[in-house]
Amino acid sequence: MMPIKVEIVSPEKVLFSRAVDMALIPGLEGDIAAMPDHAPMMLLLRGGVVELHQDGAVTDRFFVAGGFADMTETSCTILADQATALSDLSVEAAQARLAELEASYDKADKMNVPVLDLLMAKMQSARAEIEAAGGPAVQGA
């Protein structure tokens, strides 16, 4: 099988740039596999783990906090709001971020739907980060 060129880019830097057999990506509506000859598409991302596969094994894992992916027949570029290697995640930092977001949600104007939606998306991402870092699964409100 021909490889697919994958790039994972955060606002700070390029975290990954290499050809792999497949990238499993956390899409907003479910996970999707980016593989060679995939139909071109743009994909909104939810907070979750990107798994990179080579020779039948997972070689690299990154947490993305959202963003989007641009998939073509030969490449996949992931532009993440935040991206971190799984080995660099901290359960405690993600739990603290979730607590801050929950406090902000509690104080937010319940009539301001765009702000509430943004806070809900960030809380979902923080919950996914806690789980990706090896912490307990956290149920959302």
From Swiss-Prot:
It comes from the Bacteria. CDD domains: F1-ATPase_delta. GO terms for cellular component: plasma membrane; proton-transporting ATP synthase complex. F-type ATPases have 2 components, CF(1) - the catalytic core - and CF(0) - the membrane proton channel. CF(1) has five subunits: alpha(3), beta(3), gamma(1), delta(1), epsilon(1). CF(0) has three main subunits: a, b and c. HAMAP family: ATP_synth_epsil_bac. Belongs to the ATPase epsilon chain family. Produces ATP from ADP in the presence of a proton gradient across the membrane. This is ATP synthase epsilon chain.
